[in-house]
Amino acid sequence: MRAMDLKRWPRKNDDESIRARQKALGLNGGVTGIDLSPFVNAQEMLTGAAVIPVSVVGPLDIELGEYELDEPFGRVTETGRARDQVYVPLAHTEGGLSASLYRGARAAAESGGFRTYVLGDRITRASCFVCTTTEEAVQLARFLNAHVAEMRRWLAERDEAWISSFARLREVETHVVGSMCHVLWAFTTGDACGPNMMTRNAYALNMGYVMEHAPVKPERAILEANMGGDKKPSHRYFERGGHGKTVLAEVTLTNDAVRRVLRTTVDDLLELSFAGTHGAVASGMQSVAFTPASAIAAIFAATGQDLGMVGTSSMAHGTGRRVEGGIHCGLRLPGLEVGTVGGGTLFPYARTWLELMDCAGTGKVYRFAQIVAAATLALEISASASMATAGSENFFQAHHQLGGKRH
């Protein structure tokens, strides 16, 4: 391949530009042999496609909560509960993952199934206003804290087409350091994950309200200054939630299921938990869990979620406690960023897999979040059980026998 002048690199997504990029790169076959027309609006300089194999694991036996937001505060309210059996799609190339998740789901099903809960729903854009002095930054913070209701009304009354009516401002929190006033705009975004709509609305607030109405004139407005928890783990949102859905999953495994399905014992699982928790603390790990990102990334890839959000979404806190007749296992995902409308969920492949779980479209995002949490706990249970065997032989054998199969 001969390098092409960067200025001459075709950047459009029309047929001619796509073919020009493919020809210049010498690409053909599998990566270019599919119809790319559904993806022309998905990204810039579209050139080909990457196919990821998808397994379907299940059924997961889950008691799911039914939820809605109250108004005007946007608190998550449980309106009912129902049990369902769900098949979960996993897009990945990690040998052993699907089999392990299935084993965890089976152990849970034989013990009464999973139970899941949604505690909170927020997504944040953390702007920053750079002032001349600390005094001005404090004045600005006091002004913003006193005008939350006015800002909500101002945003709701805007009629510009680019401002979203679905991204609703719920809270405003300020953090002053030096001459900077960081402002955390907290939104709910309906069934969309919502990063684009809340970014537009945060920009409108910054430039149309704060810069125009504040008693001090900031020198600079920055739309995102890294306090928002976007696409990276952070202690703030691990501990308190607030960037994504805060979701819990639990199951009480019987001694029989642990012994017969997981091939280990409660004692061995608790020994692993003790050692693993100390290891997590010693390493400074943000999460207290085993392998949550594997399940979350696989579901995200199958269902058109933003893969950049796996980092935040896979922050996890797992627990295990001996109870009469078995062990109680719990998992908290404080920042699960998912959507069932918009973005990549509109692609045919994503729609198909979301529909398989009855999670496509409006009114489905809390169901989807709970299914992700249950599937993640299923993998945590099985992977932990394999590591808890003597010498972690089961974990070794799974990777030796299944992890190396690529052809």
Please annotate each region the language model reported.
Residues T188-L346:
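Glycine-rich anion/phosphate-binding loop at the beta-strand->alpha-helix junction
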Residues E136, E150-V183, T199-Y203, M207, ...:
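N-terminal loops that bind phosphate or other acidic moieties
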Residues M1-Y87, S100-Y102, G120, A398-H407:
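Acidic/polar, glycine-rich intrinsically disordered N-terminal extensions of enzymes
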Residues Q43, V57-D61, P89, A126-T132, ...:
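Short glycine-rich or small-residue beta-strand-to-loop segments that form or flank ligand, phosphate
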